[in-house]
């Protein structure tokens, strides 16, 4: 797809130079870039990075907090432009009807690989004998018959509820406790302080992996997928977004993160720092990432992107 328009003929005196001024700007309607955030710190981090860079390019990014189902409905209705948090395979059953109907497009390249998403326990619970999904029911009393999830409508919660409903691993009498990422982590931290037993939905990247001593349970391949629910995180957009807003689409297709980047960037966000402020500070310390993420990307008005973002960050 075309990312820029070149002038058919450059003046002879300028032929030795790149015709950078020939880049075409996105249409005016593309200046507003509407992201969705489903309330997870990793998505707040990546959305904060993308929004900070887009602001430096002269765009006007905004973020809407919404559940996963509402986010996908927003992409379908074109009220949301970009969602950086499609975790595959756990979200596959939720998004597949939209993709098959042609109302959502998933970009080809994941923005994160090597993620994990499955049930976890504090280290002392693991050392006490709870190593796998098959062990959970044996410790029902210590666990008070509860598995802690995050927000209602979340894909991980749905997998846990399906497991309970089917009485997999003899968990039919267990209860899924839904709240939010923050609410679940409050419960986990309280349990750790009091050395109580708890099993909860864990994932990486997330600061929980460096701030708490936790272990992931084995044996959950049939529920969360192999290798501790190994996941890819992908970017979803409306089906015609790349044609309507090619410059922004090129930018978000360039975005590739690592678990290390996200683990570290999430720490200040967990400490209540604004995601875009945290992103700006991280980008100042890691400016080399801009060259990769802004390859082939211009400012909103068609100028070279990377110099503009560096200047923007320098003024922060």
What are these regions (language model features)?
Residues 50-58, 140-174, 284:
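Ligand-binding cleft/hinge of the Venus flytrap
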Residues 80-85, 152-221:
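Ligand-binding pocket segment of bilobal, Venus flytrap-like solute-binding proteins
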Residues 31, 41-42, 162-193, 199, ...:
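An extracytoplasmic/periplasmic, membrane-proximal ligand-sensing/linker region
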Residues 23-34, 138-144, 293, 312-316:
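Immediate post-signal peptide segment of exported/extracytoplasmic ligand-binding proteins
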Residues 27-42, 59-64, 144-148, 252:
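Short, well-ordered beta-strand elements
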Residues 116-126, 230-244, 267-268:
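A bilobed periplasmic-binding-protein/Venus flytrap-type ligand-binding module shared by bacterial periplasmic
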Residues 103-152:
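A conserved helix-loop-strand patch within extracytoplasmic ligand-binding domains
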Residues 47, 64-102, 183-187, 207-212:
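Pocket-flanking alpha-helical
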């Amino acid at each position: 797809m075309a990312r820029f328009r070149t002038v058919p003929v450059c003046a002879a005196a300028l032929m030795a130079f790149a015709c950078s001024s020939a880049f075409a700007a996105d249409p005016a309607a593309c200046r507003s870039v509407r992201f969705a955030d489903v309330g997870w710190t990793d998505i707040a981090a990546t959305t904060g990075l993308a929004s900070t860079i887009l602001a430096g390019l002269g765009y006007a990014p905004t973020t809407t907090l919404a559940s996963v189902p509402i986010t996908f409905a927003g992409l379908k209705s074109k009220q949301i432009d970009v969602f950086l948090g499609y975790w595959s395979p756990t979200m596959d059953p939720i998004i597949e009807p939209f993709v098959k109907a042609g109302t959502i497009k998933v970009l080809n390249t994941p923005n994160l690989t090597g993620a994990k998403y499955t049930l976890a326990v504090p280290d002392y619970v693991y050392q006490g004998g709870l190593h796998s999904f098959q062990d959970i029911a044996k410790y029902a009393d210590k666990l008070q018959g509860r598995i802690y999830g995050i927000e209602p409508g979340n894909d991980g919660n749905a997998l846990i509820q399906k497991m309970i409903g089917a009485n997999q691993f003899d968990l039919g009498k267990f209860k899924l406790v839904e709240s939010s990422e923050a609410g679940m982590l409050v419960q986990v931290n309280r349990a750790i302080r009091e050395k109580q037993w708890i099993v909860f939905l864990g994932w990486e990247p997330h600061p929980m992996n460096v701030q708490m001593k936790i272990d992931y349970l084995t044996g959950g391949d049939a529920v969360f997928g192999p290798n501790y629910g190994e996941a890819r995180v992908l970017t979803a957009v409306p089906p015609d977004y790349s044609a309507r807003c090619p410059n922004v689409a090129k930018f978000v297709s360039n975005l590739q993160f690592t678990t290390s980047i996200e683990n570290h960037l999430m720490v200040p966000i967990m400490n209540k720092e604004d995601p875009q402020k945290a992103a700006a500070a991280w980008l100042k310390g890691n400016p080399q990432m801009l060259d990769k993420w802004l390859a082939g990307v211009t400012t909103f008005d068609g100028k070279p992107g990377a110099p503009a973002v560096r200047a923007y960050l320098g003024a922060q």
